[in-house]
Regions:
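Hydrophobic beta-strand residues in large extracellular and virion-surface proteins
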Residues: 7, 20-24, 51, 64-66, ...
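Acidic surface patches and DE-rich sequence motifs
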Residues: 9, 26, 36, 85, ...
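Short beta-strand/loop turn elements enriched in aromatics
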Residues: 40-83, 87-88, 92-93
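Surface-exposed or flexible loop/turn and strand-edge residues in extracellular/cell-surface modules
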Residues: 61-63, 119, 228
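Short linear proline/tyrosine/threonine-rich motifs used for host-factor recruitment
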Residues: 7, 13, 76-77, 90-95, ...
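Short beta-strand-centered interaction patches in the first periplasmic/extracellular domains
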Residues: 2-5, 13, 134-153, 157, ...
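Polar/acidic, low-complexity leader/linker segments enriched in S/T/G and N/D
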Residues: 1-49
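Surface-exposed cap/loop segments at beta↔alpha junctions
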Residues: 67-69, 73-85, 95, 100-216
Length: 271
């Protein structure tokens, strides 16, 4: 395996280290959470075998897959008080069924398929940390420095839901973005009649198809009030079905986050 080449910064050799932070928690059925959950109230994973993210404005529902090797460590609920009280006794080893000896910490455990459920929220952060050879006091200080640099914008590279999880090793979870919920919202019977995007999707609009999904129509799309033409809808169709069908006519729907992280459905033509 070829090692990464060092780069020179301020006369010192540095290595770019790719960092990841994956947050997994129970979804709120009423709203789509914008802020990250407290790390003491979710699963936190900082190591994986591979991450693949497929993201394009030409698809409403984008996807991601994450693979975890045997022995991947998950951080579970743990408080600073626990750490202070337990001290050095927080580190111990555990022998797995296959004979592997794993070092573990109180509040941490190795990943198991049962840790992941369909419908859970997942947020993936990726970024680079430049290793300048600095010596840190402890692992916590090093982790904080790495994440401060790697995730400086604090913008996730993927935000969505778990839709499938393998039961074998390595563990692999399949995910879909925040538009995934639109596959569970059926439309109303309509037409044939002429409609606009605002009629169908705008909050307070005539049909308001996004109501109850946690998503709203992007203000910039609402300003344009795009004319769809004459359409007919049946109750067996979902909102995702309708928005995806528009792709055939060069009208694309995709998720776009505002500066504060609020997710919107944006609709527009390609030119």
């Amino acid at each position: 395996m070829k090692l990464p080449e060092a780069i020179i910064i301020d006369g010192k050799e540095c290595l770019d280290i790719l960092c990841c932070k994956i947050l997994i928690w129970e979804a709120n059925s009423d709203v789509i959470e914008i802020n990250d959950p407290d790390e003491n109230k979710c699963l936190v994973i900082r190591e994986c075998e591979s991450i693949e993210i497929n993201d394009t404005y030409k698809k409403l529902i984008n996807s991601a897959s994450v693979r975890f090797p045997r022995g991947t460590v998950i951080k579970r609920t743990i408080t600073s008080e626990n750490i202070e009280k337990e001290g050095a006794t927080t580190v111990y080893t555990e022998r797995l069924i296959d004979g592997t000896v794993v070092e573990k910490r109180k509040g941490y455990s190795t990943a198991q398929p049962t840790d992941f459920k369909v419908g859970q929220r997942i947020r993936i952060y990726l970024g680079y940390y430049k290793d300048r050879g600095k010596v840190f006091k402890n692992a916590t200080e090093r982790l904080q420095a790495m994440e401060k640099e790697a995730f400086v914008k604090n913008v996730p590279d993927f935000d969505g839901y778990i839709v499938k999880c393998s039961v074998s090793t390595p563990i692999e979870i399949k995910c879909e973005n925040l538009a995934s919920g639109l596959k569970r919202k059926n439309v109303v019977k309509l037409g044939p009649m002429a409609v606009t995007v605002n009629n169908l999707l705008k909050e307070g609009g005539k049909y308001d198809l996004l109501r109850g999904t946690g998503l709203k129509l992007h203000p910039k799309t609402a300003e344009r009030d795009i004319n769809i033409g004459k359409i007919q809808l049946t109750e067996d169709l979902t909102v995702a079905d309708v928005l995806t069908e528009w792709n055939k006519y060069g009208l694309y729907s995709f998720i776009r986050k505002d500066t504060d992280g609020t997710p919107y459905v944006m609709v527009g033509h390609t030119y």
